């Protein structure tokens, strides 16, 4: 079934990402859950979002934050039950919100029934659901490394074979070359679609067509074939939003994956802009200042290359990234102004914007003692770098800037104990600034960051130029300003953002003369000669 523009509801949509563990606890155990999300649907409807992307809630031993799924048709008891999930899907619909699930199709948990069967014998019908190679103990089939370190091969002495895993040993890779695996996956997706799920985010989806013997782990030769079959057998049977996480995608691949003919996915997540503030050739912990002109160039490249032949996802934050207002804004003196500027800058672009929980409040990074962090990546890095001779101060500076727990502190609902997240002891400490930064203080304040996001969500629905306007980068070489225009047959929009904390002359005064200000982050926009610190203006005519 081809999907015409009317059916592509996600082009006008804004998606809200929820990290369930940290969103809202309903039973006092300190962990967020599905009933907690149901309790907060009114808040999300007020914001105006159209879909919720739920980070993994499937049954899982939680070796990798739920990205190790042991049962694709059940919910992890931490978050509730299958009944709770069905209730969330149905209640969200009443608020005009669809639910997107976070689906891992590259690998399962080693606790999954398929894998438990697969390792019993080479003749087991599930054996070929995974990738096995013969070998002697201690002599793996190759020296390939897993993404999280160590060998990509794990020995099972009972059958004298190694299985392949690109991530943890607890995450054996599924064998997509086996048509039975693909059929089982499609049946599972259709089962969720029957329950009313409105879309899927597909984790590391560009790694499913791996060929370990040839050392191919990403963008394998059969990738397009698998994508098209997956879409044909499942997604095209419903009007779904689908986003493929593709760390290895350039714009050419992204055009294939998000082809307007609807044969693969609605859009992709690409991360080219996300690694800019780290040293060349280093890890994310090796901090560097943001090369501002390069950021502009990369974002413009994705806007222009995918115009009319693909679709962008627009995001600053997710559950793995630091808070954008602390990262590229100013979370002290200009927190409100810089948070709004970053929102206006991103939401004026073409694509589907993603708001990560708390981003709409300007939630900030945290600075904890090492004992208070929960993320295994942070803890492992801390010990590794101490051994390598880094100073504790250096290491903590990197953790404060880039640690994943920055995104995972509990949602700040109000100024009561634990920010209204739980009546118990939260699984991770609440940010100390919850008494000043919280939803309760912002929802009814017309000048709040929340109200800025709410207005941006509505503007995308009201003005077609947000969806179909052609993007042109302006002032490409300007060291302080990120400006661009969007133009369709009816309207021209100009977005001008001062990215830094100094007042500067407004270089586009003539171009913007006589245009209406759609949204800005300062009340008075009558002075066309200067831009104040972090000032953002969106003009239209």
Give residue ranges: language-model regions.
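Active-site and adjacent substrate-binding regions of carbohydrate-active enzymes
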Residues: 2-541
